[in-house]
């Protein structure tokens, strides 16, 4: 037996070792534990954190951490790194990992604005294999892919997303966006939709759309109809939480029409244009518009004088064109608001913008009791009006170079740019993807080029080519030499708007690199369509010069602005332009032959003034529905200058009537 002193000393030496072991064991037990990677859940960490886990994890968890890292890289806008990481994923993924990879691939393509590239991976996804969190991302991507292209698929995605959202704010946002998506679908498409028997929520939404369109001009009737709809569809999300804009529409009151100020130039070069607008406005206001009592029938050719050039600052197509054969108007949308009723009680006071500054006239009009101003007409005066910060509601009769979104201002213009934008939509809807612009070598040509190309880019199109032509003498020289016009050109230089990151359905998409081409459809250098801005004398030379260089097998569509549309040219002219489509206002396309005859007589068949007369008629209707145009999305007017609608800046867009030369006749455009 050892002495007690020895035992005591040994015990003293052992205690620190035991304490150290216990402390070490305690520290080991309290060390942070890394949770397992869950690709079906949220990814709240940074890409650096997930990449570190990739380096430290075993092989069986490495792929999951890689997928989370890719999602974080996308969230941070690091698209090149995310793309590289996607290519480094192994081929032998399990089903959960495969579904996540497809989601990430679609997300990457959406972020790169390659929407077509996002469609294929989304089609391969098995929705039933996704977690609820993944389903949210799936429907967000479906909506993002359909941005700018209204369709029932986008609406279906919004409908499917709604039950997965828990926040009341998110649900309201969903309902508002579902409603906006519905409003953007063309009525022709609505009429042909096929709804599955189990799509009760979607059917309810479509019925609500019908309720809105049938009662849009009567707030009290709209309110009653919505209440009836809520009774019929008590479980529809919108029955419990109406779209915000629909709630506002129920409480919207027409603009005050007690006294209207007309701001027009009553002297100088623009006086003739102002007189035409004023006459159209007064005729509509006083109820002296001729109306056709029978269906429009083809009218005989009308000989008209040469065009009277207009002031370049005035928003009017610079040529005088004529109506030949009456053309049936295109089908109207369901929101069928036509020319406003006349009003004897409305006072009209005209202010001369050529004699006093616009700022002073606006103040004077307000002091005189006006509640709405129509005008000014010249671009320079519109800029001055904006600088005046007037409190009056204003329907400007031109569009400034830099549009400002003001709650009391709308912009209504007739211009070559307006026609060019409509042409871009018409040609896109006809399946054309590689247009060439054939325009005069003037500032007019430059304006048309920029307007068309900018609109084409918004639609998802690739680079637009342009070719300019000179005088009629130059064209004659070209046709005499047999040179023809080759369908080639130089790209229109449209400076893309600086894009910022956007959030769609809760999915944040970082801004793409500045040198990226957003979702463009490549033309591969082959032109499939030509938009021509030319006078009658120029067009009769240009059309055969194009025919010299192409064959009928090339299937190149030819389109033109109203600049070349004249009736007095006779059957030879119409035969020479066989197949050419052209646009014009409904009034000049046979929508109302009686009013057309009245206007043509008043202006001695000067059709540039007839268009401005129609603009005055539509200005009266727009004044009566100013609040609706300014505040109700989807509100449309069947006007004499076109089907009128407004964008978010209250720029009045015109959908024109397209006609076509066919066997010496003028028929509706195909």
Curated annotation (Swiss-Prot):
Signal peptide feature range: 1-26
S-diacylglycerol cysteine lipid modification positions: 27
Keyword entries, A-Z: Cell outer membrane, Cell shape, Lipoprotein, Membrane, Palmitate, Peptidoglycan synthesis, Signal
Keyword Membrane part of the UniProt annotation: yes
Protein location: Cell outer membrane
Membrane-topology descriptor: Lipid-anchor
Entry GO CC: periplasmic side of cell outer membrane
PROSITE patterns in UniProt: PROKAR_LIPOPROTEIN
Pfam families: LppC (PF04348)
Primary role: Regulator of peptidoglycan synthesis that is essential for the function of penicillin-binding protein 1A (PBP1a).
Family statement: Belongs to the LpoA family.
Identification of the protein by name: Penicillin-binding protein activator LpoA
Source species: Erwinia tasmaniensis (strain DSM 17950 / CFBP 7177 / CIP 109463 / NCPPB 4357 / Et1/99)
């Amino acid at each position: 037996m050892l002495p007690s002193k020895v035992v005591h000393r040994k015990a003293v030496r052992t205690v620190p070792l035991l304490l150290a072991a216990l402390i070490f064991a305690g520290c080991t037990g309290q060390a942070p534990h890394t949770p397992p990677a869950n690709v079906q859940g949220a990814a709240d960490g940074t890409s650096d954190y997930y990449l570190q886990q990739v380096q430290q994890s075993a092989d069986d968890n490495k792929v999951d951490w890689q997928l989370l890292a890719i999602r974080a890289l996308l969230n941070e806008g690091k698209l090149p790194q995310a793309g590289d990481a996607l290519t480094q994923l192994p081929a032998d993924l399990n089903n959960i990992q495969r579904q996540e990879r497809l989601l990430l691939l679609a997300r990457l393509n959406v972020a790169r604005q390659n929407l077509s590239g996002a469609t294929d991976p989304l089609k391969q996804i098995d929705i039933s294999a996704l977690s609820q969190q993944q389903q949210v991302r799936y429907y967000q991507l479906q909506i993002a892919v359909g941005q700018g292209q209204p369709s029932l698929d986008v609406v279906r995605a919004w409908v499917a997303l709604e039950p997965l959202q828990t926040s009341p704010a998110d649900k309201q946002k969903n309902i508002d966006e579902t409603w906006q998506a519905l409003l953007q679908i063309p009525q022709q498409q609505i009429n042909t939709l096929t709804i599955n028997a189990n799509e009760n929520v979607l059917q309810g939404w479509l019925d609500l759309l019908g309720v809105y369109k049938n009662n849009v001009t009567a707030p009290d009737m709209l309110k009653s109809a919505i209440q009836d709809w809520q009774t019929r569809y008590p479980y529809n999300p919108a029955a419990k939480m109406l779209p915000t804009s629909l709630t506002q529409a129920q409480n919207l009151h027409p603009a005050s029409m007690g006294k209207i100020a007309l701001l027009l130039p009553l002297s100088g070069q623009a006086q003739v244009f102002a007189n035409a607008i004023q006459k159209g406005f007064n005729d509509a206001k006083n109820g002296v518009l001729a109306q056709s009592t029978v269906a429009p029938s083809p009218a005989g050719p009308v000989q008209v004088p040469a065009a009277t050039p207009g002031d370049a600052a005035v928003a009017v197509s610079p040529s005088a064109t004529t109506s030949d054969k009456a053309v049936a108007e295109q089908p109207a949308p369901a929101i069928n608001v036509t020319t406003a009723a006349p009003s004897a009680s409305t006072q009209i006071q005209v202010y001369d913008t050529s004699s006093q500054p616009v700022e002073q006239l606006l103040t004077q009009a307000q002091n005189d009791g006006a509640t709405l101003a129509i005008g000014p007409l010249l671009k320079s005066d519109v800029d001055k009006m904006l600088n005046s910060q007037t409190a009056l509601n204003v329907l400007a009769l031109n569009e400034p170079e830099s549009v400002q979104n003001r709650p009391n201002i709308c912009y209504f213009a007739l211009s070559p740019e307006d026609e060019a934008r409509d042409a871009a939509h018409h040609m896109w809807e006809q399946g054309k993807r590689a247009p060439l612009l054939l325009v005069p070598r003037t500032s007019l040509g430059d304006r048309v080029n920029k307007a068309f190309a900018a609109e084409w880019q918004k639609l998802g199109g690739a680079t637009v080519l342009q070719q300019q032509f000179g005088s009629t003498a130059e064209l004659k020289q070209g046709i005499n030499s047999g040179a023809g016009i080759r369908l080639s050109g130089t790209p229109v230089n449209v400076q893309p708007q600086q894009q910022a990151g956007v959030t769609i359905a809760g999915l944040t998409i970082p801004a793409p690199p500045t040198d990226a081409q957003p979702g463009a459809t490549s033309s591969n250098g082959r032109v499939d369509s030509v938009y021509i801005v030319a006078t009658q004398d120029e067009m009769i030379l240009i059309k055969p010069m194009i025919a010299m260089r192409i064959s009928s097998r090339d299937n190149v569509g030819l389109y033109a602005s109203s600049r070349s549309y004249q009736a007095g040219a006779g059957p030879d002219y119409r035969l020479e332009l066989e197949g050419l489509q052209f646009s014009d206002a409904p009034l000049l396309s046979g929508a109302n032959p009686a009013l057309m005859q009245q206007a043509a007589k008043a202006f001695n068949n000067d059709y540039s003034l007839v268009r401005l007369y129609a603009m005055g008629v539509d200005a009266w209707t727009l004044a009566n529905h100013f609040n609706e145009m300014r505040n109700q999305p989807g509100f449309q007017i069947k006007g004499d200058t076109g089907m009128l609608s407004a964008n978010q800046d209250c720029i009045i867009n015109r959908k024109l009537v397209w006609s076509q030369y066919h066997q010496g006749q003028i028929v509706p455009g195909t």
